[in-house]
């Protein structure tokens, strides 16, 4: 967040800024979804409402993508994935419960777990597991946690867990009495094999998702949670106390957006081209140690030849070039001092221009740690 605030200040001053620190699509909502919202503004007052049609359409998504029969009554609409995560933690875990997640990982996991009175348990991962959690991590814990947050594709790495890995995680979690929260917010944004839902392997998993990423609707604040069987009514009691319903306009727009496949796949192709450009450019600049970006829109790169202070590295880069990237310390307080995250959810011309500036700048930086060698990340 410090880099984002600094980038905003530069923008206010009139400096050109290349926002590669945000996990926010630059593509915008599908045009027909926006038109649907306009039409509703002209015809409705817009009261509290939860769309039955949208819940049914989300259930159909699981059928079509994953071959799963999900009762629409198990789907609760939320004001984005972050409230869905808070709802899962508050509604299905007790104060003092230990909830585990991988490091590097999305900073909100640690913050949400702690803020809600549960105990964060960080599990370090590295290139040997593609920066992902696997069943061996859970087996190795002396005390099994009450919960485990799994993200595939993941933020900040973009790495995914394949079907065998998810199945092993589900089996190990079940054996040790661990309830899984699956953050599937980046589903749809994959560049090889499609992502599997944890529900394919654990029918009792808590699954959260959002319209912010694949559907390119971050500001519309709409997501959902698939509640485990028998828990939906319990969670709805929390919803009624927290936010009643998500924004009505967003629900109308999202229902249209879900069928805008050609537009959405066009967005994904933009990210795919940006990804290819960064994967070609960064190794040429000497940054070849990166996590495998199977999905999402991130590159997690080791800049350890240049720095042991990723925040200072990113601050200097921003001040001297206008290129904003995220310091690894935001995602991994232990090893993140020599990593950075690039977001390629920007337009193609901005991605290319940013890489030119970054490359010119990097070429002028000293490499005081270049003699330290590390194993390259497996593909």
Q: Which residue stretches match the model-derived regions?
A:
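Active-site PLP attachment segment
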Residues: 201-234, 246-249, 338
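Active-site phosphate-binding strand-loop segment of PLP-dependent enzymes
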Residues: 127-193
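N-terminal small-domain helix-loop-helix segment of the aminotransferase-like
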Residues: 1-80, 87, 257-258, 277, ...
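PLP-dependent aminotransferase-like
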Residues: 91-151, 171
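Structural signature of PLP-dependent enzymes
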Residues: 235-240, 257-280
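Conserved glycine-rich beta-strand-loop-beta hairpin in the small C-terminal domain of fold type I
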Residues: 255, 271-282, 290-303
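Structural motif of enzymes handling amino- and sulfur-group chemistry
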Residues: 229, 246-260, 266-267
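PLP-dependent enzyme catalytic core of the Aspartate aminotransferase-like
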Residues: 316-325, 331-379
């Amino acid at each position: 967040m410090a880099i984002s605030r600094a980038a905003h200040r530069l923008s206010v001053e009139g400096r050109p800024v290349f926002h590669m620190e945000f996990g926010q699509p630059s593509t915008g909502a599908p045009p027909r979804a926006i038109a649907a919202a306009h039409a509703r503004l002209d015809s409705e007052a817009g009261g509290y409402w939860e769309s039955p049609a949208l819940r049914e359409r989300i259930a159909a998504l699981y059928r079509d993508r994953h071959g799963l029969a999900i009762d629409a009554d198990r789907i609760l609409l939320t004001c984005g994935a972050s409230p869905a995560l808070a709802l899962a933690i508050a509604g299905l875990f007790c104060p003092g419960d230990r909830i585990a997640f991988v490091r590097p990982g999305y900073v909100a996991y640690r913050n949400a777990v702690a803020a809600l009175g549960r105990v964060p348990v960080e599990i370090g991962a590295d290139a040997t597991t593609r920066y992902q959690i696997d069943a061996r991590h859970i087996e190795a814990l002396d005390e099994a946690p009450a919960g485990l947050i799994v993200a595939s594709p993941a933020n900040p790495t973009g790495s995914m867990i394949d079907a065998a890995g998810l199945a092993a995680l589900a089996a190990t979690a079940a054996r040790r009495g661990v309830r899984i929260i699956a953050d599937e917010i980046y589903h749809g944004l994959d560049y090889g094999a499609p992502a599997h839902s944890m529900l394919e392997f654990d029918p009792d998993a808590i699954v959260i998702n959002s319209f912010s990423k694949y559907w390119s609707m971050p500001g519309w604040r709409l997501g959902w949670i698939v509640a485990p069987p028998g828990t939906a009514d319990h969670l709805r009691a929390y919803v009624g106390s927290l936010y009643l319903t998500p924004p009505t306009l967003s629900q109308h727009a999202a229902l249209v957006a879900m069928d805008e496949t050609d537009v959405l796949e066009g967005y994904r192709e933009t990210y795919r081209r940006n990804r290819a450009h960064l994967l070609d450019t960064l190794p040429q600049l000497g940054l070849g140690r990166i996590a495998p970006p199977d999905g999402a829109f991130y590159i997690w790169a080791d800049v350890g030849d240049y720095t042991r202070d990723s925040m200072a590295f990113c601050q200097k880069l921003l001040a001297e070039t206008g290129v904003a990237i995220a310091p690894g310390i935001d995602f991994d307080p232990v090893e993140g001092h020599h990593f950075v995250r690039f977001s390629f959810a920007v337009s193609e011309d901005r991605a290319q221009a940013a890489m030119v500036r970054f490359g010119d700048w990097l070429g002028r930086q000293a490499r005081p740690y270049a003699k330290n060698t590390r194993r390259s990340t497996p593909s």
